[in-house]
């Protein structure tokens, strides 16, 4: 979950054209999950704002230097990255015959329903 939050943070940082910085958490904190969920809430709100902006060329810094890409491509990559991890979770659960967790309940539609 830390990886997912950190990656979401970086995608948001790029879209908001903020300077590169790493997102770090106290891995030993008893509040780690709550802190991650709180961070995701803020990240999600920032990403939602990006949807309303015109597509544009975004220049951003990575650990490997400066890059430039359309905002729509960055958003697409973020979605593909999330989907990749979703598939990995399903494969890991399936390998161990764990089927009582329905990932459809954790889809964006399920998330939006939970907010009502």
PLM feature segments, named:
Residues 13, 17-56:
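Helix-adjacent hinge/juxtasegments
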Residues 53-58, 91-95:
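Long amphipathic alpha-helical segments
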Residues 1-23, 65-116:
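Short, contiguous alpha-helical
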């Amino acid at each position: 979950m830390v990886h997912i939050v950190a990656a979401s943070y970086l995608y948001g940082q790029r879209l908001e054209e903020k300077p590169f910085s790493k997102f770090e958490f106290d891995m030993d904190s008893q509040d780690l999950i709550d802190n991650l969920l709180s961070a995701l809430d803020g990240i999600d709100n920032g990403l939602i704002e990006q949807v309303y902006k015109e597509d544009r060329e975004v220049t951003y810094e990575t650990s490997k230097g400066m890059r430039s890409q359309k905002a729509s491509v960055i958003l697409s990559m973020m979605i593909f990255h999330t989907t990749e991890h979703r598939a990995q979770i399903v494969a890991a659960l399936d390998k161990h015959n764990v089927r009582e967790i329905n990932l459809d309940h954790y889809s964006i539609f399920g998330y939006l329903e939970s907010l009502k």
